[in-house]
């Protein structure tokens, strides 16, 4: 056994090592928990490999304090401050370091950079969009440009005023966003937790959609069953839509309208064919003529359905697809707006105009019926839509496709809180139960 003096010395050494390891671990843990480590490294390089937040020998507390204060008040715009390392910011904002503390300074510099980048991205692009959107071909196209924009502007910040000005500039300035933001801040004490969730979700959708600053774009809000057509941040057209039933939900996605088809065929989806039309036509094959439909074989030939033995067909064996001929009694009406998503969902006219008179417009199999398709088409294709041609309701007209020279972004979202055209914040029922 070691002498008492040696045992005490060994214990002191062990305690020192433990505390030293805890100190190092605590500092390095922050680096390991960075939300955007690669972007932090990019910002460091853009800053000339300097300690952006902790420059040696300089009193830079004002810059750090400005970031901490913005993060601290992030609840007012529906964000959660602890996501942005708020506790670490609060503990270290007042610290200054000497050359001997360079390791700690570098670690904290990364932490502050990560907090700033995460805050910028969330204010600029919205939070949690990927959890709502099933398909998004727009965000990934602009992700690199978004990151470059944020980092290049952060890298040239020289003062607290510069930082605050830049962070404020990242928020949308359109009145819809501002109304929702003010509702959340002004009524925070009286709002239920569910209403706060509605407002916060809506703010994030607005941030996401508006930050692209597209020249032309369309928003379909499934929750309100409405469509808005924008030019930059200005709403040019608003109309009702009919969207999917709760059992056949319209998916949320971001794609492009690439083509408008005048007098489209309706190629009936297989699910509708097998579950609805096949049983109906087996009972009464004459309904095919009444509904102006055709059977098409694998080679694209129209089949004479009067000569078929309908008894042999069932869900497991039906070698045809069903197509509805063109005309005003076509389920797609006289205009179809093709979208680039792989989800099989598109915008279209309808032969059932009465559905738009209802306050409850969740009737479709998933596609989106548009109240005023000719108006929308005229905005997308100025001077190319002949209203008389469409309103003539021609029978069996060959479909006439028109490609858009520049495809128009289409966002299909789910905002249960929305600012309407009268500048009133409206709360909608969570018809699909997505917020529960």
Which residues are covered by each model-predicted region?
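Cationic-aromatic interfacial patches
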Residues: 32-139
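Long, highly charged low-complexity segments enriched in Glu/Asp and Lys/Arg with interspersed Ser/Thr
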Residues: 145-152
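Well-ordered beta-sheet/strand-loop patches within structured domains
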Residues: 31-35, 45, 110, 117, ...
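Generic intrinsically disordered, low-complexity segments enriched for polar/acidic and small residues
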Residues: 13-17, 41, 79, 429
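Short linear sequence elements within intrinsically disordered, low-complexity coil regions
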Residues: 21-25, 58, 89-91, 182, ...
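Bacterial Sec-dependent N-terminal signal peptides
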Residues: 1-33
């Amino acid at each position: 056994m070691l002498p008492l003096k040696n045992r005490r010395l060994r214990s002191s050494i062990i305690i020192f090592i433990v505390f030293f390891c805890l100190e190092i671990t605590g500092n390095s843990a922050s680096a390991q928990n960075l939300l955007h480590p690669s972007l932090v490294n990019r910002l460091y390089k853009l800053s000339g490999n300097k300690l952006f937040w902790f420059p040696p020998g300089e009193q830079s507390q004002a810059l750090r304090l400005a970031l901490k204060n913005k993060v601290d008040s992030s609840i007012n715009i529906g964000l959660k401050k602890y996501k942005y390392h708020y506790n670490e910011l609060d503990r270290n904002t007042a610290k200054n370091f000497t050359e001997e503390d360079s390791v700690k300074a570098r670690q904290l510099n990364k932490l502050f950079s990560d907090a700033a980048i995460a805050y910028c991205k969330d204010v600029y692009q919205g939070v949690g969009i990927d959890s709502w959107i099933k398909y998004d071909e727009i965000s990934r196209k602009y992700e690199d440009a978004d990151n470059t924009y944020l980092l290049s502007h952060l890298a040239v910040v020289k003062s607290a005023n510069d930082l605050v000005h830049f962070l404020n500039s990242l928020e949308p300035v359109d009145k819809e966003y501002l109304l929702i933001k003010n509702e959340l801040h002004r009524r925070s004490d009286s709002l239920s937790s569910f209403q706060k969730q509605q407002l916060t979700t809506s703010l994030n959708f607005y941030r996401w959609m508006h930050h692209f600053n597209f020249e032309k774009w369309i928003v379909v809000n499934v929750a309100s069953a409405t469509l808005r057509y924008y030019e930059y941040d200005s709403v040019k057209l608003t109309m009702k839509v009919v969207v999917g039933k709760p059992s056949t939900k319209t998916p949320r996605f971001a794609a492009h309208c690439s083509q408008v088809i005048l007098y489209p065929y309706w190629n009936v989806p297989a699910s509708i064919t097998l579950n609805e039309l096949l049983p109906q036509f087996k009972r009464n094959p004459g309904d095919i003529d009444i509904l102006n439909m055709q059977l098409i074989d694998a080679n694209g030939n129209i089949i004479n359905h009067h000569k078929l033995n309908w008894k042999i067909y069932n869900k497991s064996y039906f070698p045809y697809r069903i197509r509805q001929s063109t005309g005003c009694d076509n389920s797609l009406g006289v205009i179809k707006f093709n979208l680039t998503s792989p989800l099989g969902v598109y915008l279209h006219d309808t032969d059932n105009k009465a559905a738009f008179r209802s306050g409850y417009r969740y009737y479709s199999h998933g596609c989106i019926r548009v109240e005023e398709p000719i108006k929308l088409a005229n905005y997308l294709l100025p001077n190319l839509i002949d209203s008389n041609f469409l309103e003539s309701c021609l029978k069996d007209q060959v479909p006439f496709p028109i490609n858009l020279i520049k495809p128009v972004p289409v966002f299909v979202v789910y905002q249960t809180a929305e600012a309407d055209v009268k500048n009133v914040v409206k709360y909608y029922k969570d018809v699909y139960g997505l917020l529960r």
